[in-house]
Design a protein with these regions (language model features):
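Sec/Tat signal peptide C-region and signal peptidase I cleavage site
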Residues: 16-22
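Substrate-binding/catalytic groove segments of enzymes
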Residues: 59-66, 97-99, 118-119
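Cystatin/cathelin-like cysteine-protease inhibitor module
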Residues: 88, 92-93, 97-98
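Residue-level recognition of short, well-ordered coil/turn positions
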Residues: 17, 40-41, 96
Length: 120
């Protein structure tokens, strides 16, 4: 009985190691550009809008105004969503060094350069 418990414990330990080595697939900038390029299918357009909106909304929701100065300041009236996405696609295509980087971070960097905050 003790041998069975030892074997089960060893299997449990090794299965945890196998799971710990699993890599998480992150959407690359090139993959996002491929989805956001026009003309886009309704599915691609929906994914592109959903992803970029979620990244921006997450930035807004998680930035604590007293602890972190804003780095994206969209002036009102804001430009059309399609205009911003089109500018992002152009930015990514002209900066191929970001093609394999995570799309969320590159999109935030683009937004920061496109909509900088006034320096005080």
């Amino acid at each position: 009985m003790k041998k069975v418990l030892v074997v089960l414990a060893a299997l449990a330990a090794f299965s945890g190691l196998a799971q710990a080595q699993e890599t998480i697939k992150v959407l690359s900038t090139q993959e996002l550009v491929n989805v956001c390029k026009l003309p886009a299918s309704p599915e691609s357009r929906s994914f592109c809008i959903g992803f970029t909106t979620a990244v921006y909304e997450t930035y807004l929701a998680t930035r604590h105004p007293q602890r972190a100065k804003p780095f994206i300041c969209v002036k009102q009236p804001a430009p059309a969503r399609d205009e911003v996405i089109g500018d992002f696609v152009k930015f990514a295509q002209s900066n191929q060094q970001v093609a394999e980087k995570p799309a969320a971070g590159v999109f935030l960097g683009f937004m920061a350069s496109r909509f900088p905050c006034a320096r005080k």
